[in-house]
Amino acid sequence: MYRLPDGIQSVDVDTDRLRMHCLVAGPADGTPVVLVHGNLATSLFWDELMAAAPPQLHLVAPDMRGFGDTEPKPIDGTRGLRDWADDVHALLRALQISGAVHLVGWSTGGGAIMQYAIDRPDAVASLTLIDTVSPYGFGATSDVDGTPTTADYAGSGGGVANPEFVQRLRDRDDGSESDFSPRNVMRAFYWHPDYRMDAEREDALVAEVLKSNISDDGYPGDHVPSQHWPGVAPGERGILNALSGRWCNVSGIVDISPKPPVLWIRGDGDLVVGDQSSFDMGALGQLGAIPDWPGDEVYPPQPMVAQTRAVLERYAAGGGETREEVIAGSSHGPFIDHLDACAALLYDFLG
């Protein structure tokens, strides 16, 4: 049975929005750092990174709405990632943590902490974006400026999740018989395929993903038909709609004041968030995996990394401090498959 590393505690916190399960580590009077996980993940994914932290930091890693052991309240997709950002703020209030905090966000969590900074720039000491979702959300944008491919953002949202994968999540499939079993999806995309995780830890992380709220209010969310390729457009409920470019746009971070320093860490082999993402409809259409693709001029792959870089360049031009670090041989979770390198970058940045 998998055990948490020494010094990490599991706690439940009642906030004025929902009950949140968290992992916490470090002295209560230490420098506060909040770690926000990504889609189809939980706080447990952070445990080894938390265990590597210097002793002066107080780390809080919540299970976000829709995932883990946090109360499974609905996700309002029309708010983008603001539900998650507001939940973090409510958690900090409940923990009586005041003042500016360091925010670390992985994938979807990166978008959530950018939204947090837009809404509360004075409350952020720094932002660390780890393989972050693009500031223009996930799917259905065509260029570095986030221009939508169609007016209804077809090809993003709750309707683009693979149905076999969704069913296996719903069935709590912890095996490895199918490429779409959650375990195999994690092995292929969450960390580098060459990385071999301890079996007990892998079992624990699979079990965490299987706690996800699989529904229209959680993952994947609802959807509506579209006259545009590939025939579905985002709905208004659930996490994939919150991530759709229709509802998620945190490019306004370039205008915040004050501007906290930003560290962007990414794996060079990320297949989830990239300019040729394995989950992007444009990229899949280009490969012939989805029929009737209308071509690059109509529906190109979303340039996710280029979009993030362009926004951070504008942030820097406006007076902000930014830094991009690429970890070679890493995938979507560099703090998993390259723990030492990622921890060194993060904790050096946090000081």
Task: Kindly label every feature range from the protein language model.
Residues M1-V33, P54-L57, I97, S156-G158, ...:
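Alpha/beta-hydrolase fold catalytic core
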Residues T147-Q307:
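Alpha/beta-hydrolase
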Residues E324-S330:
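Short glycine-rich catalytic loops that host catalytic nucleophiles or stabilize transition states
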Residues D122-T141:
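A conserved short beta-strand
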Residues H21-G77:
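Conserved HGGG/HGGXW glycine-rich cap/lid loop of the alpha/beta-hydrolase fold
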Residues P291-Y299, S330-L339:
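Catalytic histidine-centered segment of alpha/beta-hydrolase-like enzymes
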Residues A112-Y116:
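Hydrolases whose catalytic domains are alpha/beta-hydrolase-1, hotdog thioesterase
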Residues T15-D16, A61-V104, T108, I118-D119, ...:
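Active-site loop/oxyanion-hole signature of alpha/beta-hydrolase fold enzymes
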